[in-house]
Every structure is written in structure tokens, then in C-alpha cells.
């Protein structure tokens, strides 16, 4: 076999056994662990095939029909399909599907609408916001004057009176609504009324809830917002990436220019092809059933945790996620994440509102149901999962050490493997 033949023929296992081995181990982890990280999901075989396709070879700077390279006629088809499907999915007139990530989609909107030093408002990180919503360690907090709003201390719900008061005091150029750890319904209409009163743009980051919006389980930010951004993974169940949506043609032109050439060069055409596939899947009737089940499962999980003696921030959830306050179990988020991980339950430590602990320790964990729902889990399974979580945390409380309770974790791990074996994923692999 010539070198050229080998280049096009040798499989990964032969070319790079180290990477192949890591992928095989990751497949085993995903098959046997319960994934409760709210920002993660499991894509279809079709999405995997599109993302792993030969479209990865193609440079395509520009937009469909207006490229800086030749040979783009077929990647144009993929991007045009992604755009049209995104528009249909969210009922909007314009979509940019090129952002490589959630951070880049938000940066593109800032680049289009703000100048360095301008004021914008965003949800405080400790109340469930995102780094790109004005955190001082992020570009958004370094380049702009950020006015943060938060939740009320009593019920941990958004303090809309505070939003209105701060908006009137500071006259921001943009108000950003949306978050990564807020479990209740957003009042887009009230946000728009406040934005109009002070002459601000309303931007909605619906990265976490876009799948629920598409599936009819959360109110759409349109027609209230000027622009919405969303990642394409999470509850949308697509490849990792971002997009920008609007009904305003003038703003759409600004966003297109901000993405390219403002922030990015050549778009990732294999990822855009996979986005198109995922949007097509989300347009099918069964996706509405999926979104409804995600919410049902989250409610079942939250109720079970509360019955087990845990506090759920704001008292429950209306969407796919919940923040669990661990202080009643004398646990930190760091300890709980590690203990649950040893029991094959994957989650992430997360700050809770007014958290006394440091960001890398935290008093809480964030749990979500999209990935488990994709596997086929329903309320009964999530009630079982809730009981297993309580079992691990009770064992951790008794042990009162970073090492956890080995016997309890081993027993739960065995139950988890039994549960996940009933819901296989990627059987062809």
C-alpha cells in the first residue's frame, strides 16, 4: 500500500491508538454513567455522521452565494438548509448559523451593537448568569460597563423591580436576559417594556432553553427581543456551536458583519452541516414530545430531591434544570460532584444565589434532564435517580470527608450501571 493509499485508508485505531483508546473509554463512560450536566446532551447518529463528514475539508469564508473561495456550491447547500430550518424552528426572518460557540455568538452581538465603554445589563453570575453576561473575568466585563441584576434573596426569583430601577438609573444601551442556572420562566414582555422605556436593545441568550422554546415548553422571546442567541447543543440536541436570530433586517446585516469578518474567518462547515441535521430533527413532531418529557422529568427529579431533604433553589423548576442547595447535607458542591461522579452520576458544582462558598467550592450542584431524556428516561427513572443522589449525599454526610463513602458509592454505582444498561446508546459502535 502506498503512503497515499494508507493516508486515505488506515483507520483511527491503527493510526493513533492513544486517541482511539480515549474515545473508546469516553464511549464507555457515556454509556454507563447518568449524565445530569444541564448543558450537555446526546446527539443522534445522523448528527455525528454530518459532523464527521468530508465537509471538514472545506474553507468557505463569507456567506452562501458570496464566498471568498471557489468550490463552495455544496457547503452552500448545507448552510442554506441550516439557516432556513433555524428560521422555521423559531419563527424568525434571519438567522446566522456560523458562530463557533456560545461565547462567540454573544461577542458578535456586542461587536454589532456596542462600543467599548458602553453600558449593558446582564444577570449576575451568582444568580444564574453566564461569564459572557458581564463577568469581570470575561471580555464582556472588561470591555463594557456592566450593570448586573439578580434574584431576590427570599424566593430566588428574578427581581424585575430591581431590573427596572437599575435600567432607569444607568440607561444601558443593551439589556441581556437569559442565563445558565435559572430554573423559572422568563418574562420577556416585561424585559422589553423596561428596555423600551430606557431606549435599550433587548438581547436574549436562550442557550439553555432553546430546545424548550422550539418544543413549545417555554415562551419564545420573539417578538419581544431585538435579537436572540442560542447554542445549538444543550436542549436543542445538536453539535456544539452557536447562532444568532432576529426579525430586523438592518440588525441582521450588522450581526453578519460582526461574525464575519469581525470575529471569525472560515466557518466550520462540517459543524454547520450537523446543525442543519439537528434543526431538521427538531422540526419533527416527536421533538415536541421530547421537550415536554424533559420538563416532566425535571419536575419529577426536583420533587424527589426535596422529598429526600434537599433544598432546590426557588422551590422547584419550570424548565430542564435545577440548582440544588447542599447545605442541609453539610456538603459542598465540590465534594458532592466528586462523590456523585464516583457513583457514575455526572453533574457540576455550581454556585447558588448569595453563596458563601468560593466559586471552585460552591454550596450547590446544577442538575439537568436533557441527556437522560434523550436516552429514554421518563419520570420513573428520574425519581429513581433522585433517590440515588440522596443516597450518595447522605453517605457523604456520614463520612464527612473528601473521600466520601466508598460502600454507599459502590452500591449506587452498581444500580446506575443496571439502569443505564436498560437504555443503550449507539448500539452500532
From Swiss-Prot:
Give the keywords, sorted. Answer: Amino-acid biosynthesis, Cytoplasm, One-carbon metabolism, Pyridoxal phosphate, Transferase
- Residue numbers binding (6S)-5,6,7,8-tetrahydrofolate: 125, 129-131
Pathway(s) it belongs to: One-carbon metabolism; tetrahydrofolate interconversion; Amino-acid biosynthesis; glycine biosynthesis; glycine from L-serine: step 1/1
UniProt enzyme class: transferase
What GO terms describe the biological role, i.e. biological process, of this protein?
A: glycine biosynthetic process from serine; tetrahydrofolate interconversion
| GO MF annotation: an example | glycine hydroxymethyltransferase activity
For whether the record's keyword set contains Translocase, the answer is no
Q: Where does the record place it?
A: Cytoplasm
According to UniProt, the reaction catalysed is: (6R)-5,10-methylene-5,6,7,8-tetrahydrofolate + glycine + H2O = (6S)-5,6,7,8-tetrahydrofolate + L-serine
Q: Which GO terms describe its cellular component?
A: cytosol
Q: Which residues carry this modification: N6-(pyridoxal phosphate)lysine?
A: 234
What EC numbers are recorded for this enzyme? 2.1.2.1
Residue numbers marked as site, Plays an important role in substrate specificity: 233
- Pfam families reported for this sequence: SHMT
Listed under subunit, the entry gives: Homodimer.
The record describes the protein's role as: Catalyzes the reversible interconversion of serine and glycine with tetrahydrofolate (THF) serving as the one-carbon carrier. This reaction serves as the major source of one-carbon groups required for the biosynthesis of purines, thymidylate, methionine, and other important biomolecules. Also exhibits THF-independent aldolase activity toward beta-hydroxyamino acids, producing glycine and aldehydes, via a retro-aldol mechanism.
Family listed: Belongs to the SHMT family.
Stated name of the protein: Serine hydroxymethyltransferase 1
Could you tell me which species this protein originates from?
A: Agrobacterium fabrum (strain C58 / ATCC 33970)
Q: Gene encoding this polypeptide?
A: glyA1
Amino acid at each position: 500500500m502506498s503512503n497515499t493509499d494508507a493516508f486515505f485508508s488506515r483507520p483511527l485505531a491503527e493510526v493513533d491508538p492513544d486517541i482511539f483508546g480515549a474515545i473508546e473509554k469516553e464511549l464507555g463512560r457515556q454509556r454507563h454513567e447518568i449524565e445530569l450536566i444541564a448543558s450537555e446532551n446526546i446527539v443522534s447518529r445522523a448528527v455525528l455522521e454530518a459532523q464527521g463528514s468530508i465537509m471538514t475539508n472545506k474553507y468557505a469564508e463569507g456567506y452562501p452565494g458570496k464566498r471568498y473561495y471557489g468550490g463552495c456550491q455544496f457547503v452552500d447547500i448545507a448552510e442554506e438548509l441550516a439557516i432556513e430550518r433555524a428560521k422555521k424552528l423559531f419563527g424568525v426572518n434571519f438567522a446566522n448559523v456560523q458562530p463557533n460557540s456560545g461565547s462567540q455568538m454573544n461577542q458578535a452581538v456586542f461587536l454589532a451593537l456596542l462600543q467599548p465603554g458602553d453600558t449593558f445589563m446582564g444577570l449576575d453570575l451568582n444568580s444564574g448568569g453566564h461569564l459572557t453576561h458581564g463577568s469581570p473575568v470575561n471580555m464582556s466585563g472588561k470591555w463594557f460597563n456592566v450593570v448586573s441584576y439578580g434574584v431576590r434573596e427570599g424566593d430566588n426569583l428574578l427581581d424585575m423591580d430591581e431590573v427596572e430601577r437599575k435600567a432607569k438609573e444607568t440607561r444601558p444601551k443593551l439589556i441581556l436576559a437569559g442565563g445558565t442556572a435559572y430554573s423559572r420562566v422568563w418574562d420577556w414582555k416585561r424585559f422589553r417594556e423596561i428596555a423600551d422605556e430606557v431606549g435599550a436593545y433587548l438581547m436574549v441568550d436562550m442557550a439553555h432553553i432553546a430546545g424548550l422554546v422550539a418544543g413549545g415548553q417555554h415562551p419564545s422571546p420573539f417578538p419581544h427581543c431585538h435579537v436572540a442567541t442560542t447554542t445549538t447543543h444543550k436542549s436543542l440536541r445538536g453539535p456544539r456551536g452557536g447562532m444568532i436570530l432576529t426579525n430586523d433586517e438592518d440588525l441582521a446585516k450588522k450581526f453578519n458583519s460582526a461574525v464575519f469578518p469581525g470575529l471569525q474567518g472560515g466557518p466550520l462547515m462540517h459543524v454547520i452541516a450537523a446543525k442543519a441535521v439537528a434543526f431538521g430533527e427538531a422540526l419533527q413532531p416527536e421533538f415536541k414530545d421530547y421537550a415536554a418529557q424533559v420538563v416532566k422529568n425535571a419536575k419529577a427529579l426536583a420533587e424527589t430531591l426535596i422529598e429526600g431533604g434537599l433544598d432546590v433553589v426557588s422551590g422547584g423548576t419550570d424548565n430542564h434544570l435545577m440548582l440544588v442547595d447542599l447545605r442541609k447535607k453539610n456538603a459542598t458542591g465540590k465534594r458532592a460532584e466528586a462523590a456523585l461522579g464516583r457513583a457514575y452520576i455526572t453533574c457540576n458544582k455550581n454556585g447558588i444565589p448569595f453563596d458563601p462558598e468560593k466559586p471552585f467550592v460552591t454550596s450547590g450542584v446544577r442538575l439537568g434532564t436533557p441527556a437522560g431524556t434523550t436516552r429514554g428516561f421518563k419520570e420513573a427513572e428520574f425519581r429513581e435517580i433522585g433517590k440515588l443522589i440522596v443516597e450518595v449525599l447522605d453517605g457523604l454526610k456520614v463520612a464527612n470527608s473528601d473521600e466520601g463513602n466508598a460502600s454507599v458509592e459502590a452500591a449506587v454505582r452498581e444500580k446506575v450501571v443496571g439502569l443505564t444498561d436498560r437504555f443503550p446508546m449507539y448500539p452500532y459502535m
